[in-house]
Every structure is written in C-alpha cells, then in structure tokens.
Amino acid sequence: YIILPTERPPLYARTCSFSCVRAYGLEIKASGKINIGVFSDKNPFGYVDENGEYQGYDIYFANRLGKDLGVEINYVSTEAANRVEYLETGKVDIILANFTVTEERAEKVDFALPYMNVALGVVSPDSNVITSLDNWKAENKMIVISGTTAELYLTKNYPDIKLQKYDSYATAKSAIENGNGVAWANDNTEVIAFAKQNKGYTVGIDSLGSQDTIAPAVSKGNETLLNWINDEIKTLGKENFFHADYDATLTDTYGADYKETLVVEGGEVKKS
C-alpha cells in the first residue's frame, strides 16, 4: 500500500520503514536514526556492560522501538536531572530512563502510556536499618539523586530531613557505601536491586508515598511521536512483551516474585 503524508500505517505493519516514520511527521534525522536518552549506570534498567553495549529493561524496550520504527538507535547517556532538559533542547527524541510520571514533569514533557509500576524505597546498612522516617535524627543525612522523584517527595513531605544530593546513580551508590549518609532513598526497584547486588544492606522501607508509574517521555507537543509510542505499547501488550522483557532483564535480580507487581502490560495499570 502507499502511505500518504497524513496517513498513519496500520498497526499490523510491525516493521516501519523510514518513509513510514516520516508519514508520522516525526522529526528524525534523514540518516534514519532516533536519539533515545537512557541511563548508562543503572543495572538492571539501563547500563553499559563489559563489552560496551547498552543493556537492561529500558534498553530491551528501546531496541524494539527502533526495530519497529525501522531506524538505528543512537543511545544518549543521561542523568536523572538532565532528562527533561534533553527533551526540551532536542538532544533526544525519547527518554527511556526509569522516568516516573509526575504532575510537575508532565507540565514540561509529554508522557506516553506506562510500562512499569514503581514506588519509593529506602535502603540502609544492616548495622542501622531505617524502617521509618517519622523519628529521623536531625544530624542524619539521606542520600538522594538530584532530579529524582525521591528528592521531590522528601523535600515536600519531609522538609526537616537533610538531603545529601548526588548527580548520578554511581556517585550515590559510592556515597552509601562510604557512609556519607545513613540511608539512600530512590525508586524501590532500584534500592531493592542495590540490596540484592550488594551484601550488607537492607531495604527497610519498600513502599514510601504513592504508587506511581514509569513511562516513555517525549518533548511537549510532539503528538505524532507520542501517539506512535502509545499505539506501540498497546500492540506489544498483546504479545506480553513486557513480561518477556522482565524475564530477559530483571529475573536475575528480582526473581519471579516481583513480575506481576512491577510489569504494566499494554499501558493498562491493574487495580490492586
């Protein structure tokens, strides 16, 4: 069939040639590449392996997007605090970097349908496990990564807690290991992974605040790309794609127990 400039290709066309991408009006370089912002140090979601290849839950999804768009992916390493900026400045077309949907962020970027559930969690050394924030000692510091939901939540809801802020997952990880704070607050998926991968730490609080979702994000007003991603997520749900993604990238860290808790299939969040 011939795709006219105003016509959207049918969802059964699983591989979309670059001409098809242009039919969506997407501003992707004529070279046939799409720039996707991901983490490079956040195993098992987005990280660079020993061979210099990007791996993880977000990467598995990104690879499928590139395949179905029919374009090459240019991965752009990002930190949490840069995710909005990279979209606003056009450095990336999509952010797939454990991006929690919040009202504040939605004022600056457009979120697609979700693909994972998340809450906040707090990890601390076994020698002093933090199980509550209600009796926080004034001299203690909480480690957070700048630009994360954890920083925003604690600043708003626990203003008396001193925050020790770091720019990246790697530096925050080093900080808790070096005792620069009594605990580390981050997405519960990430602190659970940290505790499982590093002996001597316990997630004393595994669900802090509200239950949220993680979703792809595009620049504000980029409806063509947003609509394509939403259609793609719905279609992938029919093949249980994100369950397969979990099996391939997260099972070694979380086991099978967390699968139904974390995975969102087809963009539909199940009511608990």
Per-segment meaning from a language model:
Residues F45-Y60, L133-N135, T261-S272:
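Short, solvent-exposed loop/beta-turn-alpha elements that line the ligand-binding surface or hinge
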Residues V48-D49, A62-V71, A150-D167, A195-K196, ...:
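Ligand-binding cleft/hinge of the Venus flytrap
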Residues M116-D126, N188, I192-I233, D252-K271:
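Periplasmic-binding protein-like
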Residues S124-M142:
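Flexible hinge/capping segments at coil-to-helix
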